[in-house]
């Protein structure tokens, strides 16, 4: 049985300097975190603000607090069909690979792209763009010994277990992993327990060994299918 280490997202604690952020996470009883500099660290508005000095402060603060960095969150738009936009987003990830390595992060992580952000683009086109982005990112990750994980979301480009398996099989990279947020697989049409179990069976049997981080959150759906957040107790997620 694999050992699970309980953590929390850094930006759920608000924006702070690295020392305050990691101290707060550790004092809350968590052993690791998902650190997204652009969401959790004061003064960071873009990846250009993630300087070597700031990275060293974060590394030192993490070590002092006993909080590991499980995921270096580099959440960008990997599935833009517009090549100029897509290439710019992939470049952001490439700039952060040395950061993840310096931090000793378990992996880097990103979702793909919300389909609503590019009307008129088909999911197949968005997935092909995702593969092109990963084709730029993964060779650099392999060279520098960093894992890169993608996260499935049912309204994004990579939206089903079938899509995840396609990406893993197509890229065939030893450094490609999966972040699994169970809630993100569940749309209103698959909210029943039986439907969810069919999803979980696919996730576990097809690529369970590729899952490097798991997220938990609560959600449910209004009668019209509108998504809303809940506690874990009130969640429709089985």
Where on the chain are the PLM-derived regions?
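Active-site-proximal loop/turn and secondary-structure-junction residues that shape catalytic pockets
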Residues: 12-14, 37-39, 75-78, 112-117, ...
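A short, Lys/Arg-enriched amphipathic alpha-helix followed by its capping loop at the start of a domain
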Residues: 2-6, 24-30
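Acidic/histidine-rich catalytic cores of soluble enzymes
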Residues: 33, 125, 132-236
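Active-site acidic/histidine proton-transfer and metal-coordination neighborhood
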Residues: 19-20, 24, 56-57, 61-65, ...
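Glycine-rich, proline-tolerant flexible connector loops at the mouths of alpha/beta enzymes
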Residues: 34-59, 112-119
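Boundary/entry segment of secreted carbohydrate-active catalytic domains
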Residues: 1-16
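Short acidic/polar active-site loop segments enriched in Thr and Asp
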Residues: 31, 68, 106, 212
């Amino acid at each position: 049985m694999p050992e699970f280490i309980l953590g929390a997202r850094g930006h759920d604690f608000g924006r702070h300097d690295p020392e305050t952020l990691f101290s707060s996470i550790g004092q809350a009883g968590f052993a690791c975190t998902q650190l997204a500099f652009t969401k959790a660290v004061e003064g960071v508005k873009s990846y250009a603000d993630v300087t070597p000095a700031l990275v060293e402060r974060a590394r030192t603060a993490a070590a002092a607090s006993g909080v590991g960095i499980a995921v270096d969150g580099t959440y960008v738009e990997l599935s833009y069909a517009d090549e100029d936009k897509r290439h710019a987003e992939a470049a952001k990830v490439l700039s952060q690979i040395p950061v993840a390595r310096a931090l000793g992060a378990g992996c880097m992580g990103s979702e793909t792209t919300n389909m609503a952000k590019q009307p008129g683009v088909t999911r197949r086109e968005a997935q092909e763009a995702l593969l092109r982005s990963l084709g730029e990112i993964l060779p650099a990750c392999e060279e520098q010994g960093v894992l890169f994980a993608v996260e499935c979301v049912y309204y994004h480009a990579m939206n089903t277990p079938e899509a995840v398996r396609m990406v893993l099989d197509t890229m065939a990279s030893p450094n490609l992993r999966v972040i699994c947020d169970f809630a993100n697989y569940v749309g209103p049409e698959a909210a029943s327990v039986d439907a969810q179990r069919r999803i979980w069976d696919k996730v576990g049997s097809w690529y369970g060994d590729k899952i490097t981080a798991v997220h938990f959150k609560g959600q449910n759906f209004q009668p019209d299918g509108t998504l809303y957040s809940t506690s874990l107790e009130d969640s429709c997620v089985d």
